[in-house]
Amino acid sequence: MKKRFLSICTMTIAALATTTMVNTSYAKTDTESHNHSSLGTENKNVLDINSSSHNIKPSQNKSYPSVILPNNNRHQIFNTTQGHYDAVSFIYIPIDGGYMSGSGVVVGENEILTNKHVVNGAKGNPRNISVHPSAKNENDYPNGKFVGQEIIPYPGNSDLAILRVSPNEHNQHIGQVVKPATISSNTDTRINENITVTGYPGDKPLATMWESVGKVVYIGGEELRYDLSTVGGNSGSPVFNGKNQVIGIHYGGVDNKYNSSVYINDFVQQFLRNNIPDINIQ
């Protein structure tokens, strides 16, 4: 993980979306040292993908780009349909015989918040993206499947995108099947505040929901940093405050220092209001 760094900006960010290795000979070597169960039964190998707005650290020595910090308090969520967990979603994109996976959160009748670098894996075709809200594992999707319809990238540099999905086979909207998450106005968000990042890390069995617990260490502009640990596949995970409101969308981190999300400040909130008619910001 020490070479082939991109030079778009001065800070190196470890990408936290899981995707398929195109170089299969290299992929086989990487995958052998990791938990194969998180890749499903097809032995699909994974690597990070490039974000359109951040320096991404290419995965060289491990399949799942990760920023594991001293605070590695991660635990599995089994009651995925309960409370605010219901809106947390597993994102799946088939790519070149394999797949990419990430995370997101339902925030409107038809809308999911995630990262640009996650939806970019669909190569411009949102119908390649499947969303499974409150997924329990690769064989148990209690709230079914929704297919992407439209991608709306945030106009700024921040790694944020809205994914609009079509109704399911029963003509139900995703925001009818699960209760959309509440967005925090962030007027009270502070340093040292307790937070959680909840999503679908790639080092765990496929499509299992995990929560990481930590504290805010920095707030500035459209960036929120924290001291908790994350792994590839967590990209797009919602960052929840103590009221279970979304204060950010996780995208990456810096080795041995911190993890980061897009902070939902006033500019981001206006973007959400402009594109999600029923967005709930409190």
Curated annotation (Swiss-Prot):
Keyword Secreted: yes
The reaction(s) this protein catalyses: Preferential cleavage: Glu-|-Xaa, Asp-|-Xaa
EC number, as in UniProt: 3.4.21.19
Signal peptide, first to last residue: 1-27
InterPro entries: Glutamyl_endopeptidase (IPR050966), Peptidase_S1_PA (IPR009003), Peptidase_S1_PA_chymotrypsin (IPR043504), Peptidase_S1B (IPR008256), Peptidase_S1B_tx (IPR008353), V8_ser_AS (IPR000126)
Gene Ontology biological-process entries: proteolysis
Keywords: Hydrolase, Protease, Secreted, Serine protease, Signal, Virulence, Zymogen
Propeptide: 28-66
Source domain of life: Bacteria
UniProt-listed SUPFAM superfamilies: Trypsin-like serine proteases
PROSITE patterns: V8_SER
Residue positions of the active site: H117 (charge relay system), D159 (charge relay system), S235 (charge relay system)
GO terms assigned for molecular function: serine-type endopeptidase activity
Compartmental location: Secreted
Cellular compartments per GO CC: extracellular region
Function as written in the Swiss-Prot or TrEMBL entry: Exhibits a significant hydrolytic activity for the carbonyl side of glutamic acid. Shows activity toward human fibronectin and type 1 collagen.
Family: Belongs to the peptidase S1B family.
Subunit structure: Monomer.
Name of protein: Glutamyl endopeptidase
Organism this protein belongs to: Staphylococcus epidermidis (strain ATCC 12228 / FDA PCI 1200)
